[in-house]
Every structure is written in structure tokens, then in C-alpha cells.
């Protein structure tokens, strides 16, 4: 007999002829369900979901779980619609806005679940190479539901909606746990699910093979086509080194031929960026390339979920500027997510040589300059200016290089796997008595998901307005927005504006007790570890932070872009 299975305990015995051994009894079904649900956060709910599925085949059980999760999210979507309808005329503008947003992101979750089920097919054994991507989509499904609740400010509505979508969140959470167990087991056994059925257990590879398997000989991702690499490389000032300045310098079309040109003076096809986005095709296998000529464009821009693979580039981060002033504090009917000047809902977004601003000011409270919900976002040589929640790295995998980002409260925040490399991070002067927090990660689940913010080889300083008061205005590296917040600061210059304790607690919560904060090989007066909070880890060796490198944190594709920029895969 050949043992075919994974370390979560779901083991099927198959003889050489491919026939199943053992009794096909209810007992075997119960054991399979018990083993599959062993990794779930809510084991009781997991078992209850799978009890009607009279099979001990892991593929059938997992697919049944996905379908049950999809059904639960559908019910959550319907519940949201009925809640909105029930509130009727009693509903204020903000409640309507947030419920509309909830309906939208729940539809995103449904679309991703449909994709997951389709990609899984009838036999999980054929999905081995896709497991990490399936898990990434599942993480998004969970995050979308979390987004809905996070955006609700009104306590009673928050309570009602929290209870209304509770079941679908539990199932989504359990689904992530199951896929995490599968991918972890495959990694430990160094075997793909589709290899297991054939008995091709293979030889033990070098430790990093699985992590780097999607990179080519130059250390660049195979998923990123030669055409895309050329686009990013050519979308800059001709003859200039791509690392010229940090978020500054020239841009321009270079040798690239854009699909659409935006110009305020009418010399392009469109005068607004939103018009150009509307002209991009949905579900595009290629690139929609939008060149935005120098100018200040005051508009809110949303890239819809179905309008994927959009690449925007401008004439420089201080020359091509997209700006708006929508905020939670000053704009009726606005939530954090809806305040974003630019909102990217789709996968495969790229940007270069553009400035993004939210000018609501410190009194606007949450006021996002740039929000990304889509997976595989790549941003080079851009600038992000705001106050609270400037850069909302909300979902998926995101890579930033040579950017400037400025703000006050939680100004780099979200629920994604994000690496910001070789960038300038500026704390600003907010309202009197206001405290600055550079990061606020929103990871809600434990080890099963790869979510967190990594600052690598950056500079954290005070901007010009804060400079004189930098020692009296309290500034911290971050605080935990959610229970399992994860942030790493590596090889970074930290100015003296940062408090000696380094990190702060979230007021009224004990998230710091379960959060993960790591520092390694930093420099500057603000990097002294002597007075750091006891719950932050001061790593002593590279091995302790290896998991936060680009090659490891942004798997499976690793997304290193050529783009005329030197990219560090490792430390």
C-alpha cells in the first residue's frame, strides 16, 4: 500500500491498482472529517458543515466546504441587503454608504469563492501548484467581510451586521485554516498534491526551492511577463536611473506606447483619469496602460475589481498628482474605505511616477490617499501624502519601492502582505496633542495567514513642519490594530522622533500581547533597543527575520519586478 495524504491527518490508502482500501463506512467519514477539521479555529462548525457529506475523500470534503462557505457568504450578502431595506428612511447617509460598501465587498468575496471552486475542479489532486494562490484568494474572502465591519462606526449597526455575517466569517476562517494545513504539509513533505496521487514523493530539495520556484534565473517572477517588465522599465525619464531620488524626479512616457493618454489641457484622449479607467477592458489578459501627463487632477479614482492589469504612469511624483479631500470626519456619507483618493479593487495594478494625495487635513480623521484591495500590486517611484490612514494596504500582496509616504495616525495600515523597500517615511504634524503611529497592521488570524507590513531599508524621519517639534510630539513605529498585528522593521534608519519604547498599545485593547513586532539591524538614534517595549522582539540574527524578506513574504510569485530598479530578494 502507498500512503497518500498530508500531515493534517487526512490519509487515504491506495493500492498499486489505484483502488481504495479499507471500509467505506460512516466511521471512515467521521475520521476524515475529524482529521480535516483538526486545524480549524472553530472545529465544531467545521464538523457540522461537513457532516452531511457522506464521503471520506479529502477532495470532495474540501470542495463541499468551499461550496458551503459560498452559500454562507451569499446569505450574508442577502442579509446586508435586507438590513438596508429594513432601515428605510431612518438610515443616514453614512449608514447607507457603509451598507452599500458591504454589499460590494461581499460580492467580491463571492466572485473569489466562485474562482476558487472553479480552479479546484473536481479533484483537489490536480490543484497542487495552485494551493498558495487559492489560499491567497481565501484570505481575501475573509478580509472583505472584515472590511465591512471595520467601516461601520455606528455601534448598533456594527453589532447587527457583525452577528448577521458571523457564520460566513467563521466558515471563511475555517477554510483558510484547512488550506494552510494542506500547504504547510506539502511544504514539509516537499511534495505537491498532484504528485502524491502518482507516488512521486521526490527528493529533498534545498530549503528555499519552494519559496523561489516561481523565479527565473535573474530572480524575477515567471508570472510577470517580459512585456510587463519592459513596460515598467520604459515608463520613466529616458536615460535616468530608476532609483533617481525617492519618489521624486522625472517620469514621462519614455519609449512606452500607452493605451490611453490623460491630459488636463486636452492634448490626450481624456481629460480625467476616471474616463481613461472606464475605457479599460474587463478581465483583460494584457495591460491597460494609462499615461497621465503632468498636472494636478482633483478627482476620486476607482479601478473596479473586474478591470484588472491596469498600469498607470506619470511625469513624476511631484508633477503628476491625483488629489482629493474626502474624509470620515468632514465628508457626510464617507467611510475609511470610501475616502480613498485612488481605490484599487482589481488584481495586477502597477503605478510609477505619480503622486497621490488626500488633502482633508488632520481634522478629517480617516482620509486615505491610496487604497489597494487587489492582489499583486506593484508601486515604484510614487509619493503618498495625507494625515490619518494615508496608505491603506488593505488586501492581497503588495510591493512598494522608492516611495515617499507621509502622515500622522496609522498612516500605513491594512490587512495585506506588504513590503515597502528603500523608501522615505515621513511623520507629519497633526492636531494639537495628536500622537503619530507609522503603522497599524490589521491581521485578525494567527499563523494561518501571511499578513503584515515589512519596512526594509527605509528611512523614518520628521517632515519639515514637524522637525522643530519632533521631540515633543510623540511618534511611534506602530500599534496593533487587530489581535495578530504583524510588523517588521529591518535595515532601516530611524530618526530621533521615534519614542524610545518604539511601539504603542491600541487604546483599550490588549492586542499587543498577541501581536508580532520585530526589529533587526536598524540604525539611527531612534533604533536604540534599550528602552523598547518588552513585547517587541529585537532579532539578533538574520535567520530570525528571513521570513520577512521579499522572496519569502510575497510568495508564491514573489513579485520582483525588473523595472530598472535593484530589488532585494533577501536581507
Swiss-Prot record:
<dbReference type="GO" id="GO:0046910">
    <property type="term" value="F:pectinesterase inhibitor activity"/>
</dbReference>
<keyword id="KW-0964">Secreted</keyword>
<feature type="site" description="Transition state stabilizer">
    <location>
        <position position="388"/>
    </location>
</feature>
<dbReference type="InterPro" id="IPR035513">
    <property type="entry name" value="Invertase/methylesterase_inhib"/>
</dbReference>
<keyword id="KW-0378">Hydrolase</keyword>
<dbReference type="InterPro" id="IPR033131">
    <property type="entry name" value="Pectinesterase_Asp_AS"/>
</dbReference>
<comment type="function">
    <text>Acts in the modification of cell walls via demethylesterification of cell wall pectin.</text>
</comment>
<dbReference type="InterPro" id="IPR011050">
    <property type="entry name" value="Pectin_lyase_fold/virulence"/>
</dbReference>
<keyword id="KW-0063">Aspartyl esterase</keyword>
<feature type="binding site">
    <location>
        <position position="366"/>
    </location>
    <ligand>
        <name>substrate</name>
    </ligand>
</feature>
<dbReference type="Pfam" id="PF04043">
    <property type="entry name" value="PMEI"/>
</dbReference>
<dbReference type="InterPro" id="IPR012334">
    <property type="entry name" value="Pectin_lyas_fold"/>
</dbReference>
<dbReference type="InterPro" id="IPR018040">
    <property type="entry name" value="Pectinesterase_Tyr_AS"/>
</dbReference>
<feature type="binding site">
    <location>
        <position position="336"/>
    </location>
    <ligand>
        <name>substrate</name>
    </ligand>
</feature>
<feature type="region of interest" description="Pectinesterase inhibitor">
    <location>
        <begin position="27"/>
        <end position="178"/>
    </location>
</feature>
<dbReference type="GO" id="GO:0005576">
    <property type="term" value="C:extracellular region"/>
</dbReference>
<feature type="region of interest" description="Disordered">
    <location>
        <begin position="233"/>
        <end position="254"/>
    </location>
</feature>
<keyword id="KW-0961">Cell wall biogenesis/degradation</keyword>
<feature type="binding site">
    <location>
        <position position="479"/>
    </location>
    <ligand>
        <name>substrate</name>
    </ligand>
</feature>
<dbReference type="GO" id="GO:0045490">
    <property type="term" value="P:pectin catabolic process"/>
</dbReference>
<dbReference type="GO" id="GO:0042545">
    <property type="term" value="P:cell wall modification"/>
</dbReference>
<dbReference type="InterPro" id="IPR006501">
    <property type="entry name" value="Pectinesterase_inhib_dom"/>
</dbReference>
<protein>
    <recommendedName>
        <fullName>Pectinesterase/pectinesterase inhibitor</fullName>
        <ecNumber>3.1.1.11</ecNumber>
    </recommendedName>
</protein>
<feature type="active site" description="Nucleophile; for pectinesterase activity">
    <location>
        <position position="410"/>
    </location>
</feature>
<feature type="binding site">
    <location>
        <position position="481"/>
    </location>
    <ligand>
        <name>substrate</name>
    </ligand>
</feature>
<feature type="active site" description="Proton donor; for pectinesterase activity">
    <location>
        <position position="389"/>
    </location>
</feature>
<dbReference type="GO" id="GO:0030599">
    <property type="term" value="F:pectinesterase activity"/>
</dbReference>
<dbReference type="InterPro" id="IPR000070">
    <property type="entry name" value="Pectinesterase_cat"/>
</dbReference>
<keyword id="KW-0134">Cell wall</keyword>
<comment type="similarity">
    <text>In the N-terminal section; belongs to the PMEI family.</text>
</comment>
<comment type="pathway">
    <text>Glycan metabolism; pectin degradation; 2-dehydro-3-deoxy-D-gluconate from pectin: step 1/5.</text>
</comment>
<feature type="region of interest" description="Pectinesterase">
    <location>
        <begin position="259"/>
        <end position="558"/>
    </location>
</feature>
<comment type="similarity">
    <text>In the C-terminal section; belongs to the pectinesterase family.</text>
</comment>
<dbReference type="Pfam" id="PF01095">
    <property type="entry name" value="Pectinesterase"/>
</dbReference>
